[in-house]
Amino acid sequence: MALDFLAGCAGGVAGVLVGHPFDTVKVRLQVQSVEKPQYRGTLHCFQAIIKQESVLGLYRGLGSPLLGLTFINALVFGVQGNTLRALGRDSPLNQFLAGAAAGAIQCVICCPMELAKTRLQLQEAGPARTYRGPLDCLAQIYRQEGLRGVNRGMVSTLLRETPSFGVYFLTYDVLTRALGCEPGDRLLVPKLLLAGGTSGIASWLSTYPVDVVKSRLQADGLQGAPRYRGIVDCVQQSYREEGWRVFTRGLASTLLRAFPVNAATFATVTVVLSYARGEEARLEGDAGSAALAQPSSL
């Protein structure tokens, strides 16, 4: 159990390092003004950030997801595994339900973490920055808006994370069964990369419009008076001003990010588990018994 958790954390770190630049681009595209858009698309956004802020601009707000990573993985692994055992049978439906439960519970950490990440990604570079880092960002929000401000976007985060984690674990379970992912298979790692990457894409496609609303709510008021009264008002205003396409803004960068992030996550998890269990077998004097371990979840 502890080894799985450690491997999951290592995989999560790898996933964040690979995917954060894409996430920065996604957020900036989602919240930019339709009247005066700063970026023409995903590629132009990448180029503009690097030109104006250097490559480090793509990693703005990185501290927030890294800071919450250990706790989020603990919740996801623990809740998903315990829920699956409580349901009594490892079936696709139970994988969905266990994943949905894990997604809902980890919102307690995910929502404030993403709020800080979004604010840091959107602030301008330079000495006049509002926030010095994720903790300073959350501390300032708490002083100004209280606990409610720190949890801004919680409902939309729940609406996104609950079904998306369910879809993720369901897709991953179906694909690993179909691909025949078994310990000792020499193609296990490529199969896990394919299953994990595809599952990540499926989970994002299932709830992406909700993510757009969540980003807008969490960025609301950063550059002036708040515009939205809540989720429904945000949806109505966004649709009225920009049409249905607003709910797919930044989707390209998100899907570009989804596959490599999950590929990096599962490759790292597999390597860590294999090395650790190989060491265990060596210490026990039975090196031949250490099979390549398949991670149980993201």
UniProtKB/Swiss-Prot annotation:
Q: Which Gene3D superfamilies match?
A: Mitochondrial carrier domain
Q: Per the record's keyword annotation, is Cytoplasm included, yes or no?
A: no
Known InterPro entries for this protein?
A: Mit_carrier, Mitochondrial_Carrier, Mitochondrial_sb/sol_carrier, Mt_carrier_dom_sf
GO MF assignments:
basic amino acid transmembrane transporter activity; high-affinity L-arginine transmembrane transporter activity; high-affinity lysine transmembrane transporter activity
Location in or out of the cell? Mitochondrion inner membrane
Q: Where are the Solcar repeats?
A: 2-86, 90-178, 185-275
Signal peptide annotation: none
Q: Which superkingdom heads the taxonomic lineage of this protein's source?
A: Eukaryota
Q: Does the keyword Repeat apply?
A: yes
What reactions does this protein catalyze?
L-lysine(out) + L-arginine(in) = L-lysine(in) + L-arginine(out); L-histidine(out) + L-arginine(in) = L-histidine(in) + L-arginine(out); L-ornithine(in) + L-arginine(out) = L-ornithine(out) + L-arginine(in); L-homoarginine(in) + L-arginine(out) = L-homoarginine(out) + L-arginine(in)
Gene Ontology cellular-component terms for this entry are: mitochondrial inner membrane; mitochondrion
Per the record, a Pfam family? Mito_carr
Q: Keywords on this record?
A: Amino-acid transport, Membrane, Mitochondrion, Mitochondrion inner membrane, Repeat, Transmembrane, Transmembrane helix, Transport
Q: Which GO terms describe its biological process?
A: L-arginine transmembrane transport; L-histidine transmembrane transport; L-lysine transmembrane transport; mitochondrial L-ornithine transmembrane transport; ornithine transport
Record field: transmembrane: 2-22, 61-81, 96-116, 153-172, 187-207, 255-275
Membrane topology, record value: Multi-pass membrane protein
Family the UniProt entry places it in: Belongs to the mitochondrial carrier (TC 2.A.29) family.
Role of this protein: Mitochondrial transporter of arginine, lysine, homoarginine, methylarginine and, to a much lesser extent, ornithine and histidine. Does not transport carnitine nor acylcarnitines. Functions by both counter-exchange and uniport mechanisms. Plays a physiological role in the import of basic amino acids into mitochondria for mitochondrial protein synthesis and amino acid degradation.
User: This chain belongs to which protein, by name?
Assistant: Mitochondrial basic amino acids transporter
- Origin organism is Bos taurus
